[in-house]
């Protein structure tokens, strides 16, 4: 995750969890509609800008046999300057967004820890 020193660093957060770079599961359930496609497309487009050094799209990491192993990978490239970053928060399995409220503190704590490990922070 190399970054320059003059461009913008953009952090996008989408807590739903079923976010990946390819074969989006649009319509799988109520949580996999247009937002998942929008945030992936937005991260890619921002990563193409000359004034942007790096874009991280943060979501929940899922280790769940009912979903693809892709969602268990902590890091996935979207483009040269854009990545999906998966952070542990709450249970490992996929849960509907309405059940995520109790786990947002965990997501925040783990995200802050991850950010503090990054070279530019």
Model-derived regions: residue spans:
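Short, conserved, GDST-rich strand-edge loop motifs in beta-rich repeat architectures
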Residues: 22-27
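Short-chain dehydrogenase/reductase
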Residues: 28-37
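A conserved catalytic-core segment of Leloir-type glycosyltransferases
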Residues: 2-20, 32, 41, 45-120
